[in-house]
């Protein structure tokens, strides 16, 4: 079987890891292996391809099982382990590899993210520690269109997180890279663009100012700060050119292309080590190694064959790389450029220098911009209208000037003359100053798009193929039909009688969206934390991705886990009204007796009492929403005292189809009397898996279930959406119904709360 065919089998074999709901067990894998071995004995390329694909599927699934093994066997108790740090902020966040557990070596080492202080020695990469750890499986919030942190953690081979109970340094020496980085950081203290230079040279992006990150995102140049194929291939090219130049002063028998090629690969590996050996850098090195091997084979390979072999080798070496978004961005970027230059090449010999170079750069950037639209929209929910102009400026400056200057300065920093190093750093700093001066002159070009644009984003691919085949001449009806299908989401409208309530997965907090006819209301805005809030990170992207216009906010009470995202949301939709029991300026009242209508839905406030301005859980704004057939009771954080007072005054109005479980399922709420009076069919609870109060309480869960409620909670189900219509209501949970994936499961013990 030819190598590209084998690579194609590997790619096909690993793709099921993207959508398998559960991983096949040992008996299924044994059966697949036996079938593959039986097929190998038969003749024919197709049969051999099926057999190899089956064997590689088994390999991929076994790799996934191995990645999940620590979540089943290393959690649930305090463990003592030896950990080698690979990354640290020097304070309370550390990433590393567990190499020994209770005296036994772990192979392969288990990646872990740790929280806590390491004393008395200052933490740095490369240190060897003996730690007492409280380990737990990775668990992430899951919202439609949001960042998938569980998938990301598994792609990075870090299935565990934990707290440091105790630690002692077995070897406090920092790694050679960490010592070099410290020396380099001290050397660059006087340069204004030192953070960007460290990012480009060493892959250190933690110190980048937020303003620079936002600017690069808005101009579509963030990819330049990632140590990816572009930087590592550039480092390899510099080594190759350097060695090629040296060869010209050597005897003729020493001149050849093989030695520079191998030296370039060695230089790429060395640079990847210098940048921390992150997974994208390792994948790039493997791809370069495959390219070198194909070149050394003496055969002719097409661009598509090289692409297949590189991607196939990466996925065989690391099957979980199939979960990595950065891998698919890189793979599709290369595939898109191959497609672009083959299907829409520039006419040869039409322009002279310098116009030939300028037009070639524009042609290249146009291909990247247009053909990556589907992935960019799917991953980032928007496009940069200024990315073309920004990259035409940034790519030459960074790749041809800044990065070579930085790499040369890093080499000179080891032993070269100080004056030469200073001149190199100064030149790189001035190049970056020119770059960001130009980027700041561009208008804010970031355009947020919603899910309706996903299908139409593949139009550039279809237009190139249609232009090449002249389809618009031969099959105009087919072209119009395809265009109609791509634009169909823009004309599709939900049923007029349908409305939805979505409980977003915001961790230990509450944020619910009521939507109808393309409009939305919020009940609470989730928690906030020192670096951000749920409004900025979850609610605003979710509303925009679903093409919803926010018209109002109901705020249950003043606690930060319920109002944390309020300021961010109001900044995005300043015209939205706010209703709360707090009596704050510009807030409409939310007290018992208040009634209003919105989009044909009836809203009735049941608590707190009129005129009350007290604060706290027991003064949460309780609202009942109904459409005349079905209803939902939103309770905030009320506890038993408020429940009993509300029932004694307003018990006739509490009956509802569904209830938002009060106070995240705390044992101080959801009294038996309230559960009985509401008499609902389902209960929805919002909490985080690892909250300090172990909510929802096991007793509360059982209380609802014994009364016939169906129980739904964001730790288990992720985002929960209730669809109301004339036919009744349905609940769709993201983790186990809409996107049931093996990497979305609840890893570890069956329950951690209660």
Kindly label every feature range from the protein language model:
Residues 1-74, 78-82, 243-255, 259, ...:
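Transmembrane helix-bundle segments that form internal channels/tunnels in multi-pass membrane proteins
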Residues 20-22, 272-281, 296-300, 317-327, ...:
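Membrane-interface helix caps and helix-loop-helix hairpins in membrane proteins
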Residues 54-223, 533, 537-541, 545-549, ...:
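Membrane-interface helix/helix-cap signal primarily in integral membrane proteins
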Residues 155-285, 292-293, 422, 568, ...:
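Aromatic-rich juxtamembrane segments at the membrane interface
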Residues 315-316, 320-322, 440-548, 552, ...:
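Core dinuclear metal-dependent hydrolase active-site scaffold
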Residues 550-561, 659-663:
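Metallo-beta-lactamase
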Residues 554, 558-593:
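Active-site HxH/HxHxD metal-binding segment of metal-dependent hydrolases
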Residues 643-718:
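Cap/insert and terminal regions of metallo-dependent hydrolase folds
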């Amino acid at each position: 079987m030819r190598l590209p065919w084998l690579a194609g089998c590997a790619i096909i074999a690993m793709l099921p890891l993207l959508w398998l709901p559960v991983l096949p067990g040992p008996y299924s894998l044994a059966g697949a292996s036996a079938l593959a071995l039986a097929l190998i004995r038969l003749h024919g390329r197709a049969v051999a391809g099926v057999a190899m694909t089956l064997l590689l599927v088994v390999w991929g699934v076994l790799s996934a099982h191995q990645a999940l093994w620590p979540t089943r066997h290393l959690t649930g108790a305090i463990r003592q382990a030896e950990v080698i740090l690979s990354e640290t902020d020097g304070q309370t966040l550390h990433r590393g590899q567990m190499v020994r557990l209770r005296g036994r070596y772990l192979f392969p080492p288990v990646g872990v993210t740790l929280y806590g202080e390491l004393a008395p020695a200052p933490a740095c990469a490369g240190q060897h520690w003996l730690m007492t750890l409280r380990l737990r499986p990775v668990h992430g919030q899951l919202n439609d269109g949001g960042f998938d942190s569980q998938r990301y953690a598994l792609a990075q081979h870090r299935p565990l997180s934990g707290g440091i109970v105790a630690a002692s340094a077995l070897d406090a020496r920092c790694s050679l890279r960490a010592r070099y980085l410290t020396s380099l950081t001290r050397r660059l203290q006087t340069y204004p663009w030192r953070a960007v230079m460290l990012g480009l040279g060493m892959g250190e992006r933690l110190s980048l100012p937020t303003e620079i990150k936002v600017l690069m995102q808005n101009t579509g140049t963030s990819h330049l700060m990632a140590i990816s194929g572009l930087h590592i291939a550039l480092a390899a090219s510099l080594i190759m050119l350097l060695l090629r130049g040296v060869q010209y002063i050597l005897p003729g028998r020493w001149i050849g292309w093989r030695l520079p090629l191998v030296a370039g690969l060695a230089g790429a590996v060395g640079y990847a080590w210098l940048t921390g050996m992150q997974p994208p850098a390792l994948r790039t090195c493997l791809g370069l190694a495959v390219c070198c091997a194909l070149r050394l084979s003496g055969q002719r390979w097409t661009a598509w064959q090289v692409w297949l072999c590189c991607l196939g080798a990466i996925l065989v070496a690391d099957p979980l790389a199939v979960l990595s978004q950065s891998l698919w961005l890189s793979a599709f970027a290369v595939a898109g450029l191959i497609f672009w230059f083959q299907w829409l090449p520039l006419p040869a010999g039409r322009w002279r220098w310098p116009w030939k170079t300028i037009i070639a750069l524009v042609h290249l950037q146009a291909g990247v911009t247009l053909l990556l639209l589907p992935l960019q929209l799917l991953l980032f929910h928007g496009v940069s209208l200024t990315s073309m102009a920004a990259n035409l400026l940034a790519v030459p400056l960074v790749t041809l000037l800044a990065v070579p200057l930085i790499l040369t300065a890093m080499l000179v920093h080891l032993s070269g003359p100080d004056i030469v190093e200073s001149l190199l750093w100064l030149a790189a700093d001035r190049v970056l100053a020119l770059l960001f001066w130009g980027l700041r002159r561009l208008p804010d070009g970031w355009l947020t798009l919603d899910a309706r644009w996903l299908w139409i984003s593949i139009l550039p691919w279809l237009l190139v193929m249609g232009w090449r085949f002249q389809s618009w001449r031969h099959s105009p009806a087919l072209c119009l039909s395809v265009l109609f299908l791509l634009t169909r989401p823009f004309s599709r409208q939900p049923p007029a009688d349908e409305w939805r309530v979505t409980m977003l997965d915001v961790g230990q907090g509450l944020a619910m969206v009521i939507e109808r006819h393309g409009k939305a209301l919020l009940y609470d805005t989730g928690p906030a934390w020192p670096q951000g809030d749920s409004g900025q990170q979850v609610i605003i992207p979710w509303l925009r991705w679903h093409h919803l216009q926010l018209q109002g906010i109901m705020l249950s009470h003043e606690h930060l886990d319920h109002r944390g995202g309020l300021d961010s949301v109001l900044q995005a939709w300043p015209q939205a009204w706010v209703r709360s029991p707090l009596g704050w300026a510009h807030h409409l009242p939310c007290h018992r007796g208040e009634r209003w209508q919105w989009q044909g839905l009836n809203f009735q406030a049941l608590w707190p009492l009129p005129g009350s301005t007290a604060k706290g859980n027991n003064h949460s704004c309780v609202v009942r929403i109904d459409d005349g057939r079905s209803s939902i009771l939103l309770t905030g954080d009320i506890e038993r005292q408020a429940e009993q007072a509300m029932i004694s005054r307003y018990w006739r109005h509490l009956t509802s189809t569904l209830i938002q479980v009060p106070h995240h399922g705390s044992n101080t709420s959801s009294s038996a009397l309230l559960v009985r009076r509401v008499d609902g069919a389902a209960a929805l609870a919002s909490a985080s898996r690892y909250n300090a109060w172990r909510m929802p309480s096991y007793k509360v869960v059982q209380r609802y279930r014994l009364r016939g409620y169906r129980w739904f909670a964001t730790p288990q189900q992720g985002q929960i959406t209730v669809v109301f219509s004339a036919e009744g209501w349905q609940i769709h949970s993201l983790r186990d119904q809409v996107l049931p994936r093996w990497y979305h499961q609840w890893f570890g013990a069956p329950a951690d709360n209660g």
